[in-house]
């Protein structure tokens, strides 16, 4: 029985391992946000984005960030298990489009197409022990249904995101700190963690800080390939 379970597990994990073992790179995408997004959402996104491509040059995902994500203050480090306490839960961060079938950090299959990206926090309820050391995530919501800019309350955020995966669990991408070596260059980068088998897009999130006339840049790392430890 144990052998059978091991074989079934290996078969189930095969696609995940294959994706993680591929090579990826990030490039600037000089293309406007997709028409699948609402006009209101497109209006607050950058005119160009970032494309994640595999070693064959095939696009895996495309990302557009918000021109100025509202922030409650200047970034000043983490607060407990929250890396980005200046961000409000449910706030719009940007948008993502999967060129083909994509996968979230829980290895849930996500259909090709456009999704909004909103900031969320992992619940502290004992169900997520060992998944990650921080609580920060970007939740994917269907572009056709998430059409307003305003931040969403937690229940609507999680329910809307669950529709992206077609399950009872939100569709999530891990949001974590950008390595200093990658973020100091001021250019987008893709970081490969061989131990965790993840690929993270290091991209500059522009913050509209209360009381500040100029935007503040916060480098973040969005895990676009790879899954949570089991």
Feature names for model-found ranges:
Residues 21-84, 141-230:
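Primarily secretory-pathway and cell-envelope proteins
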């Amino acid at each position: 029985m144990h052998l059978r379970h091991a074989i079934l597990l290996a078969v189930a994990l095969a696609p995940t391992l294959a994706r993680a073992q591929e090579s990826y790179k990030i490039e600037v995408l000089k293309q406007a946000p997709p028409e699948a997004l609402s006009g209101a959402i497109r209006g607050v996104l950058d005119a160009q984005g970032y494309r994640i491509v595999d070693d064959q040059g095939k696009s895996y995902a495309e990302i557009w960030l918000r021109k100025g994500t509202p922030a409650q203050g200047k970034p000043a480090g983490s607060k407990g298990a929250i890396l980005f306490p200046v961000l409000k839960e449910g706030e719009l961060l940007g948008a993502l489009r999967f060129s083909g079938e994509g996968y979230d950090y829980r290895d849930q299959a996500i259909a090709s197409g456009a999704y909004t990206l909103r900031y969320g926090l992992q619940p502290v309820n004992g169900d997520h022990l060992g998944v990650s050391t921080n609580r920060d995530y970007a939740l994917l919501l269907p572009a056709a249904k998430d059409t307003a800019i305003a931040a969403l309350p937690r229940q609507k955020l999680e329910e809307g995101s669950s529709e992206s995966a077609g399950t009872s669990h939100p569709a999530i991408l891990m949001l974590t700190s950008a390595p200093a070596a990658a973020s100091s260059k001021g250019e987008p980068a893709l970081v490969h963690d061989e131990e965790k088998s993840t690929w993270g897009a290091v991209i500059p999130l522009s913050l509209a800080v209360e009381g500040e006339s100029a935007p503040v840049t916060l480098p973040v790392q969005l895990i676009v390939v790879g899954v949570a430890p089991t």
